Amino acid sequence: MSLQQKIKAYLKLGKLGVVSLLDLAAVAGAFLAYKHGISLLPIIPMFIGGTLASMGAMIINSGIEIDRDKVMSRTSKRPTVVGYVNRKEAIIVGSLLAILGTALGFIDNILTAFFIALGVVIYIFVYTILLKPRTWLNIVIGGFAGSAAAWAGYTSLTNSLTLEGFLLGFLIFMWTPGHFWSLALKYREDYVNAHYPMLPAVVGITTSARAIAISNALMIPIVLLLGYYINLIALIAFSILSLFLMFLSYRLILNPTKEEAIKSFIFSNIYLMLILLIMIIVKLI
């Protein structure tokens, strides 16, 4: 296997799509903390470090889950499953990236490095190893891994975590269950076959659709409170986006199918991305 092919395999294992959203959360956290006269340079080591650590965590996750990934159609083509990267190699390379990413966080401050490391620890040890194979609460508690990215971004400029910074991380925590349950509903049979107790594999489609709607509804007050802290423009934009999210959640309850679930999943991605982009834009204008 050539070096180019090996790098391509690791980039696939690193889940750049997921990591890019975590990066956006981190940058949004930094801009949320931004005040006139504060240097934006600390964003650079935080961004690079967070990216490397997040990719490292994803690679370790793929190394740990090879056996179950083999029986899931969604993951059966991963480089770890087809043999391009073995378990030991994935864990070693992922660990090195996570350590390097955390080390870069120290360029800013100890708190930023702590939150970068915290995201890795929660994703690997709490979510992947402890909770995912054992309880439907796996993604609920595991959502704090995404929160850590936002907190790393916020603390990179402030070396402290205030209420508004906490709210951004808590927003991501609240967003995570409904988002991933929508995906799990689409691939319910995969999780059943792999013996993962993801909520849709445990309670069925109809109850899962209701749980997704409830989870999204519980998130919205946090979104609106954050919008209130930012400014009126953000609050109005967040309200409009949240109304459409709940419309899709309502449609999923009325028609709990895989097709509606994937629509909910796709828009929840767009929803969070737009929330984070709006936060950045209103700080720039």
UniProtKB/Swiss-Prot annotation:
> What's the Enzyme Commission number for this chain?
2.5.1.141
What enzyme class is recorded for this protein? transferase
Pathway noted in the entry: Porphyrin-containing compound metabolism; heme O biosynthesis; heme O from protoheme: step 1/1
Q: Which UniProt keywords apply?
A: Cell membrane, Heme biosynthesis, Membrane, Transferase, Transmembrane, Transmembrane helix
The keyword Transferase is assigned to this record: yes
List the protein's name.
Protoheme IX farnesyltransferase
| Family classification | Belongs to the UbiA prenyltransferase family. Protoheme IX farnesyltransferase subfamily.
For this UniProt entry, which segments traverse the membrane? 13-33, 40-60, 89-109, 110-130, 137-157, 165-185, 194-214, 230-252, 265-285
Q: Name one Pfam family in it.
A: UbiA
Q: Which GO terms describe its cellular component?
A: plasma membrane
Provide one Gene Ontology biological process annotation.
heme O biosynthetic process
Q: Where in the cell is it found?
A: Cell membrane
* Coiled-coil spans in chain: none
Query: What InterPro entries does this protein map onto?
Result: Protohaem_IX_farnesylTrfase (IPR006369), UbiA_prenyltransferase (IPR000537), UbiA_sf (IPR044878)
Any other comment in the entry?
A: Carbon 2 of the heme B porphyrin ring is defined according to the Fischer nomenclature.
Cited function: Converts heme B (protoheme IX) to heme O by substitution of the vinyl group on carbon 2 of heme B porphyrin ring with a hydroxyethyl farnesyl side group.
Membrane topology per the entry is:
Multi-pass membrane protein
Which classification does the entry list for the species? Archaea, Thermoproteota, Thermoprotei, Sulfolobales, Sulfolobaceae
- Catalytic activity field: heme b + (2E,6E)-farnesyl diphosphate + H2O = Fe(II)-heme o + diphosphate
Q: Main subcellular localization, coarse class?
A: membrane
Q: What is a single molecular function from GO for this protein? A: protoheme IX farnesyltransferase activity
